[in-house]
Amino acid sequence: LLDTDFSIEATAATTTAGSGSKVAEASTSDYRVAVFGAGGVGKSSITQRFVKGTFNENYVPTIEDTYRQVISCNQKNVCTLQITDTTGSHQFPAMQRLSISKGNAFILIYSVTNKQSFAELVPIIEMMKEVKGNAIAETPIMLVGNKKDEESKREVSSNSGQKVATNMECGFIETSAKNNENITELFQQLLALEKKRQLALTMDDPDGKNGKKKGCHIM
């Protein structure tokens, strides 16, 4: 589906917010992805599982962390996937707005075991509409229900998540950072939604079959 395939190199650089990185300096461009969601839904776990391949059982609240994954193109172009793991607290709205204004794409995460975390995405969505304006229509967005491994504790059905994603006209997937389920697929589908650049991860799904290349509209 995509003419240009990108592959992830074996090494990735991780930085905290505000710090520099040799990876960033070597890149011709950054593709900035901001990850939003309530505290404890697994934002850091999903990001670290994707970038580092690791999972930490202990919950450590995040103010803001930035992870950079080097992506190389078949045509030898260099692109850096910059993933910002944002705070789950409502105490830092200015930081959230800044992440939205700079972001090229967004991942909205809730826990399938917590209805409240599902509801807490609403103010983030409203802020995205306010900050991005009409540009939100062409912005790739994935709605993610994490912790699908805890099925016995589920409070949000898959159908509920899919209905919201359908209304938003964006991507939807359920993941388990703990079991490394659908983590790579999440980022594959996110990049497949990008219209302005042809981006793809040449891993399990080189043709981007799991993602539909379309814009995301928030009503």
Swiss-Prot record:
Q: Where is this motif: Effector region?
A: 59-67
Q: Which UniProt keywords apply?
A: Cell membrane, GTP-binding, Lipoprotein, Membrane, Methylation, Nucleotide-binding, Prenylation
The way it spans or sits in the membrane comes to: Lipid-anchor
Per its UniProt entry, which superkingdom is the organism in?
A: Eukaryota
Provide the lipid-modification sites (S-geranylgeranyl cysteine): 216
- Report residue numbers covered by any propeptide: 217-219
Which Gene3D superfamilies does this UniProt record tie to the protein? P-loop containing nucleotide triphosphate hydrolases (3.40.50.300)
Question: Would you name any one GO CC term?
Answer: plasma membrane
User: What happens when you mutate residue 40 to V?
Assistant: Probably constitutively active. Does not reduce paralysis induced by aldicarb treatment
Q: Where in the cell is it found?
A: Cell membrane
Q: What is the effect of changing residue 45 to N?
A: Probably nucleotide-free or GDP-bound. Reduces paralysis induced by aldicarb treatment
Cysteine methyl ester modifications at? 216
Alphabetically, which GO biological process terms does the record hold? Answer: signal transduction
Q: Which family does it belong to?
A: Belongs to the small GTPase superfamily. Di-Ras family.
Q: What does this protein do?
A: Displays low GTPase activity and exists predominantly in the GTP-bound form. Together with epac-1, may regulate acetylcholine release at the neuromuscular junctions probably downstream of G-protein gsa-1 and adenylate cyclase acy-1.
Q: Self-association or partners: how does it assemble?
A: Interacts with epac-1 (via C-terminus).
Q: What name does UniProt use for this protein?
A: GTP-binding protein drn-1
The species this protein was found in: Caenorhabditis elegans
Primary gene name: drn-1
